[in-house]
């Protein structure tokens, strides 16, 4: 059997580095029990993976998808958002009629400062050394 080199596979995957990543991922898949698409012929898993890519029995695009999926730690699921989001306190919400006429009292800065001056400062507590 002739040796499989990167040159045999370079027409299937343009980038040599991508080819190595894909072949290594396929070799790991074979090690974990994935079905072979060609005869083993007493070859090791990386050689079998390269032969599968060279013979086009495995799609490089599918291998790339599987590689990306295996490296993801969190898979984000896109859910359609509703067209309109109900606002809090909108007219459509169940609000009592009495709540709509609440008057908010405004304070000036001077009134706020006077109110703060009237507050008692917190008592100082002695620090305990442990």
Curated annotation (Swiss-Prot):
<comment type="subunit">
    <text>The RNAP catalytic core consists of 2 alpha, 1 beta, 1 beta' and 1 omega subunit. When a sigma factor is associated with the core the holoenzyme is formed, which can initiate transcription.</text>
</comment>
<comment type="function">
    <text>Promotes RNA polymerase assembly. Latches the N- and C-terminal regions of the beta' subunit thereby facilitating its interaction with the beta and alpha subunits.</text>
</comment>
<comment type="similarity">
    <text>Belongs to the RNA polymerase subunit omega family.</text>
</comment>
<keyword id="KW-0548">Nucleotidyltransferase</keyword>
<dbReference type="GO" id="GO:0003899">
    <property type="term" value="F:DNA-directed RNA polymerase activity"/>
</dbReference>
<keyword id="KW-0240">DNA-directed RNA polymerase</keyword>
<dbReference type="GO" id="GO:0006351">
    <property type="term" value="P:DNA-templated transcription"/>
</dbReference>
<dbReference type="GO" id="GO:0003677">
    <property type="term" value="F:DNA binding"/>
</dbReference>
<dbReference type="Pfam" id="PF01192">
    <property type="entry name" value="RNA_pol_Rpb6"/>
</dbReference>
<dbReference type="GO" id="GO:0000428">
    <property type="term" value="C:DNA-directed RNA polymerase complex"/>
</dbReference>
<dbReference type="InterPro" id="IPR006110">
    <property type="entry name" value="Pol_omega/Rpo6/RPB6"/>
</dbReference>
<keyword id="KW-0808">Transferase</keyword>
<dbReference type="InterPro" id="IPR036161">
    <property type="entry name" value="RPB6/omega-like_sf"/>
</dbReference>
<dbReference type="InterPro" id="IPR003716">
    <property type="entry name" value="DNA-dir_RNA_pol_omega"/>
</dbReference>
<feature type="region of interest" description="Disordered">
    <location>
        <begin position="110"/>
        <end position="130"/>
    </location>
</feature>
<protein>
    <recommendedName>
        <fullName>DNA-directed RNA polymerase subunit omega</fullName>
        <ecNumber>2.7.7.6</ecNumber>
    </recommendedName>
</protein>
<keyword id="KW-0804">Transcription</keyword>
């Amino acid at each position: 059997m002739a040796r499989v080199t990167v040159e045999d596979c370079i027409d299937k995957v343009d980038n040599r580095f991508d080819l190595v990543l894909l072949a290594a991922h396929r070799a790991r898949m074979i090690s974990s029990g994935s079905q072979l698409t060609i005869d083993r012929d007493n070859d090791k898993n990386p050689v079998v993976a390269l032969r599968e890519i060279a013979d086009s029995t495995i799609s490089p695009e599918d291998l790339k998808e599987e590689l990306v999926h295996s490296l993801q730690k969190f898979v984000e699921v896109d859910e359609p958002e509703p067209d309109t989001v109900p606002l809090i306190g909108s007219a459509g919400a169940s609000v009592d009629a009495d709540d709509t006429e609440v008057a908010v009292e405004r304070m000036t800065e001077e009134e706020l400062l006077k109110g703060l001056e009237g507050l008692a400062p917190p008592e100082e507590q002695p620090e305990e050394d442990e």
